[in-house]
Amino acid sequence: YAKFAVSCRKVETMTQQLRFIPFKSRSDKGWAEAWALYEASFPDCERWDGTGYDRAFGDPHFEADGIWRGDEFIGILFHWNAGDYRYVEHLAVSPRLRGQNMGSKALAAFCQGRRVILEIDPPEDEISVRRQHFYQRLGFVANPYAYIHPSFRRPFHPHRLVLMSYPEALTYEEARGFADFIRERVLRYSEHENPELPRL
């Protein structure tokens, strides 16, 4: 399939090869399965609609990767290139692969040689605590800054998140620059017209 030749990053693991292949449009091979996984994995407030992706595909900072093991689609990793770091916006692995550590393998592979930032819910219950520990086992650090993120879709409900960074903590200036990047670039593809958040 021709699209497989475009910017394919291969990552060797102990028993298999993972490939990160960027989608360029919603007509690409695997997008329907990727979209179904996306909708099943994230609530409405954390998702864009399809037209937002149509516009974002033309942004050189954005990449929507399908994760493949051979010819088998296994997950998604949607991320942004902010120059000094990558922002992982959405990561999900097919539920049929639970127990195989594919999420940790894919994220560890993606992080090699990079600075990476992502957001998680505050560790206030068993699930959110487990999620934070998952990222910490991979080398991510929780940052102490007050960070409020608006939802992507109406009605907007700002919510507190924790910034996790790899392989080291963020300075305040770095965290503030990240908030500016989200507000000024990422949210232009959401339903916001003039977002005021996030800010530090």
Residue ranges and their predicted role:
Residues 119, 132, 136-156:
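Conserved catalytic-core motifs of GNAT/GCN5-like acyltransferases
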Residues 66, 71-81, 85-92:
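Conserved beta-strand in the GNAT
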Residues 12-52, 161-163, 177-199:
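Short amphipathic alpha-helix that is part of the acyltransferase structural core
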Residues 56-66, 157:
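A short helix-loop-beta-strand connector motif used in the catalytic cores of GNAT acetyltransferases and
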Residues 93, 99-112:
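Conserved acetyl-CoA-binding loop-helix of GNAT-fold acetyltransferases
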Residues 1-13:
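Short, Lys/Arg-enriched N-terminal segments with co-localized hydrophobic residues
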Residues 112-127:
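Conserved GNAT acetyl-CoA-binding A-motif
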Residues 163-170:
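Conserved beta strand-loop-helix elements of the APE1-like EEP
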